[in-house]
């Protein structure tokens, strides 16, 4: 839920107008909209590059996952790993656009640790894949945009750690 929706829901629940503090938060949200959209456009437009480069970096740092017996061993399992990385990048994009981590958590992180544990997938490798995407994506943006996007990547990483 965006800051705008949250503020309206809270004010309406109390049958009141928006407070000056709520209006200030909404103003900051609206003012930052162009930057959030620019970041989302960069992530969306560069998603194949981000996922591929981050995947290559992950597999260099964690050769165990692409070796025989590893969770990403073989063409099909490597493709599955890259698909999952793309999914988390998409979630980060949702967070950036909304200016909130709620969509990330509600759409895709509930039960993620348990799911990977049940599949025998090392969750630390999944978290590392998100770190690698953060690094690659940050190199495609200004330092201000990278700092904004980093908060959402870090949220995903934190939920996996």
Swiss-Prot record:
Q: How does it assemble?
A: Heterodimer of an alpha and a beta chain.
Q: Which residues bind (2R,3E)-phycocyanobilin?
A: 81
This molecule's function is given as: Light-harvesting photosynthetic bile pigment-protein from the phycobiliprotein complex. Allophycocyanin has a maximum absorption at approximately 650 nanometers.
N4-methylasparagine, modified sites: 71
Q: How does it sit in the membrane?
A: Peripheral membrane protein
Name of the protein: Allophycocyanin alpha chain
User: A GO CC term?
Assistant: phycobilisome
Source lineage: Bacteria, Bacillati, Cyanobacteriota, Cyanophyceae, Synechococcales
Gene for this chain: apcA
| Source domain of life | Bacteria
Describe the PTM. Contains one covalently linked phycocyanobilin chromophore.
């Amino acid at each position: 839920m965006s800051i705008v929706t949250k503020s309206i829901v809270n004010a309406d629940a109390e049958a009141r107008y928006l407070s000056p503090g709520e209006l200030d938060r909404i103003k900051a949200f609206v003012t930052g909209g162009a930057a959030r959209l620019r970041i989302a456009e960069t992530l969306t437009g560069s998603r194949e590059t981000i996922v591929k480069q981050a995947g290559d970096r992950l597999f260099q740092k964690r050769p165990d996952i692409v070796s025989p017996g590893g969770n990403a061993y073989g063409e099909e399992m490597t493709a599955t790993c890259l698909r999952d990385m793309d999914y988390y990048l998409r979630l980060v994009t949702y967070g950036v656009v909304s200016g909130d981590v709620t969509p990330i958590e509600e759409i895709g992180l509930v039960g993620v640790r348990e799911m990977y544990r049940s599949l025998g997938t090392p969750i630390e490798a999944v978290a590392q894949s998100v770190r690698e995407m953060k690094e690659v994506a940050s190199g495609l943006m200004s330092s201000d945009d990278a700092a904004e996007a980093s908060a959402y990547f870090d949220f995903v990483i934190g939920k996996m750690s």
